[in-house]
Regions:
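Substrate-binding/active-site clefts of carbohydrate-active enzymes
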Residues: 24-49, 56-67, 74-207, 245, ...
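N-terminal Sec-pathway targeting helices
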Residues: 1-7
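Bacterial Sec-dependent signal peptides at the C-terminal "C-region" and cleavage site
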Residues: 14-26
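Alpha-helical packing segments of well-folded alpha/beta enzyme cores
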Residues: 57, 100-104, 186-201, 217, ...
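Loop/helix patches that line or flank the sugar-binding groove of alpha-linked glycan CAZymes
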Residues: 27, 306-315, 320, 324-456
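Conserved, mostly hydrophobic/aromatic
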Residues: 35, 61, 71, 88, ...
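Active-site-proximal helices and loops of the catalytic beta/alpha 8
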Residues: 105-109, 113, 123, 128-139, ...
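Bacterial N-terminal signal peptides
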Residues: 7-14
Length: 456
């Protein structure tokens, strides 16, 4: 099968060309590993991936070349993905304890790595104290913490996508609502919450705290709610400013709710550090030279000084790249673009071994996304110590699972195969780390007349 492209990166190492490279100094060679900890490695045999399991596998991530880890939300939730909180202040017991979290963070830092935490504090479930205490109680100290549709506070507002409830894969019905981000009390609470995860023991040192946060579904005007406008200036920027006062080195990454948005307004109005290069992701998957260049010149070329774009191929809300593009050589080609074009590359766990998965259509349930979030495949057989089959025997997403024995898509099958996708990822990441031009340079297109050659 002919490749649509031959990748031809032009590596400019001569001293006379250093002027084109960025004067900014991000973490040299930073490579983020975006991991659903529930699906990664189970340390205690309950089929749930957990914090101790992730800590056990840090040597694997370092061997791959990963320098930073981005976790899914940690807090207590009825949702398997933990995006809608029952309690922001409690870690999901299936992940472990607060001490397990601190042990993980300390070990990450001991190894010279960084750790980021996904935070979605814009919604809460009916199990949250704000809901429980405020609904029907105008005297509640939480009366302005969530939005209501009526003056008597009997009906909480809808949440994202104008939903009132979610049907869990395990049969749970989960009610949720939107947090009132215009409340000064809510802003103060968020400052305290984020600050706690940055410095749990409040000693002014950050070895036991996260290095930054991912802000899920961030918007200036949240979900079209009439009262939740101008949030960049009134909520996000004050929050971020307060966090930087605590630790100037903290990194704030925002996921733009509109994936066609380049994110420049987030940089300007909310002072976000990093955005996701969705446009470049779509262009890479298209293997369309014109689209790749157009998006790279905007996303990588026009991002303001001091700000960065995260470059990626897949994430937890998308079909796995290996299910979209089944050709191994094209998978490797996309990886080359991911690591060599610029920005901060991010790998979604299992991407490095070509894990497959698409969204299901099994009715109104959050189980439809499980195909995109299956257990990391450590073994040829698909079974063994640490396999995180938390969705086992729970429904059609188990009987239709992508994971198969002896399919070539496991670490065990690929780690000693010099031609495997895993080995290509490993070699490409280490190549990037060895050259400042690749790890810290700015993207610059080098024009050529061949429609099948991309040079930069």
């Amino acid at each position: 099968k002919n490749l649509f492209y031959i990748l031809m990166p032009v590596l400019l190492f001569l001293l006379t060309n250093w002027m084109i490279w960025s004067q900014r100094e991000p973490v040299k060679g930073e490579v983020i590993y975006h991991v659903c900890q529930r699906s990664f490695f189970d340390s205690n045999g309950d089929l749930n991936g957990d914090l101790n399991g992730l800590r056990e596998k840090l040597p694997y991530l370092q061997e791959l070349g990963v320098t930073s880890i981005l976790l899914f939300p940690l807090y207590e939730s009825d949702c398997y993905h933990n995006y809608f909180a029952n309690d922001f202040e409690q870690i999901d017991s299936e992940f472990g304890t607060m001490q397990d979290y601190i042990d993980l963070v300390n070990e990450v830092h001991r190894r010279g790595m960084k750790i980021y935490l996904d935070m979605e504090t814009q919604y809460v479930t009916s199990q949250h104290v704000w809901w429980k205490d405020a609904v029907g109680n105008l005297e509640s100290k939480y009366s302005d913490f969530i939005l209501f549709e009526d003056e008597s506070h009997q009906t909480p507002a809808t949440m994202v996508f104008d939903l009132r409830l979610l049907n869990g894969f395990d049969g749970k019905v989960i009610y949720a609502t939107t947090v009132n981000l215009k409340s000064k009390n809510v802003l103060d609470y968020n400052i305290a919450l984020f600050s706690y995860f940055m410095d749990p023991n409040k000693d002014g040192k950050f070895n036991d705290g996260v290095d930054g946060f991912r802000l899920d579904h961030a918007m200036d005007h949240l979900d079209g709610k009439p009262t939740l406008t101008n949030l960049f200036a009134e909520f996000w920027k004050p929050l971020i400013t307060s966090l930087r006062q605590l630790n100037p080195a903290v990194k704030i990454v925002a996921e733009q709710a509109n994936w066609s948005d380049y994110g420049f307004e987030y940089f300007e109005k909310a002072d976000i550090d990093r955005m996701f290069g969705f446009g470049l992701q779509q262009a890479i998957l298209s293997f369309n030279k014109t689209e790749i260049i157009r998006n790279a010149e905007v996303i990588l070329g026009q991002t303001p000084a001091g700000k960065e774009q995260i470059v990626f191929i897949e994430n937890h809300d998308m079909d796995r790249f290996a299910s979209v593009e089944k050709d191994l050589q094209r998978q490797k080609l996309a990886a080359s673009l991911l690591f060599y074009m610029g920005g901060v590359p991010s790998i979604y766990y299992g991407q490095e071994i070509g894990m497959k998965g698409k969204v299901y259509s099994f009715g109104n349930t959050d189980g439809n996304d499980i195909g995109r979030r299956e257990a990391f495949d450590w073994y040829t057989s698909g079974e063994g110590k640490g396999m995180s089959h938390w969705y086992k025997d729970s429904g059609a997403w188990w009987t239709n699972a992508n994971q198969k024995a002896n399919d070539g898509i496991s670490l065990e099958e690929q780690e000693n195969d010099p031609n495997s996708l895993f080995q290509f990822y490993k070699q490409t990441i280490h190549m990037r780390a060895q050259h400042h031009a690749l790890s810290s340079g700015n993207y610059l297109n080098v024009e050529n007349s061949n429609d099948h050659v991309l040079s930069f």
